[in-house]
Amino acid sequence: MYIGIAGNIGSGKTTLTEMLAEHYQWEPRYETVVDNPYMDDYYKDLHRWSFALEVFFLKERFKDVLQISESENNIILDRTLHEGVFVFAANNYAQGNISDRDFETYMELYEIMVEKVKLPDLMIYLRSSVPHLVENIQKRGRVYEQKIPIEYLQGLNDRYDDFIRNKYKGKVLVIDVDKLDYKTRPEDLKLITDQIDSVLSI
């Protein structure tokens, strides 16, 4: 079984991935952020580095999903191939950070890749307001994230809603996380696991 956790920057994906992996004894896989050689440059100059950053992420996510497809383990993945394309890369393109030519090349790469992999058995989307995202980003203190514009986060939120409603073809569980604190309140985690159990018939 393959579960994907989707959500904006600061929505709590990694924390929930860790907790669900422990709860269900699933194997967690995490997005490669620290190792992305373009990350610091990207936040300093979005226009110059967006295409390189997105291609790097696309390559890493494709490698992850290929490994998952060959594994017999139950795996939960922090951020999916598909949201990387239809949310983050599409947002960079819409904001003029990726040229028409580069985006066309990027989408052609994605179309080749997506034919080789399956959709998650369940996509869990953590929906969050921008103020909640900003609060979480400030708390965790990653230096390269502190200068992210509010407009950028709002653009990503809009893209996520469009992605979940109109573009993604698989099974989705939407969880509004603004009023949840599953890291410190067991009852909040149980609210989530009860929904997962119901959707997956566990």
Q: Where are the regions that the model predicts?
A:
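Hydrophobic anchor at the beta1->P-loop junction of P-loop NTPases
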Residues: 5
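P-loop (Walker A) phosphate-binding loop of NTP-binding proteins
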Residues: 8
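Conserved lysine of the Walker
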Residues: 13
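Post-Walker A alpha-helix
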Residues: 16-17
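Conserved substrate/cofactor phosphate-moiety recognition/catalytic segment
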Residues: 22-60
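A basic- and aromatic-enriched beta-loop-alpha substructure that forms the phosphate/nucleotide-
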Residues: 61-101
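A glycine- and Lys/Arg-enriched "phosphate-lid" helix/loop adjacent to the NTP-binding pocket
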Residues: 87-158
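NTP-dependent small-molecule kinase module
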Residues: 134-202
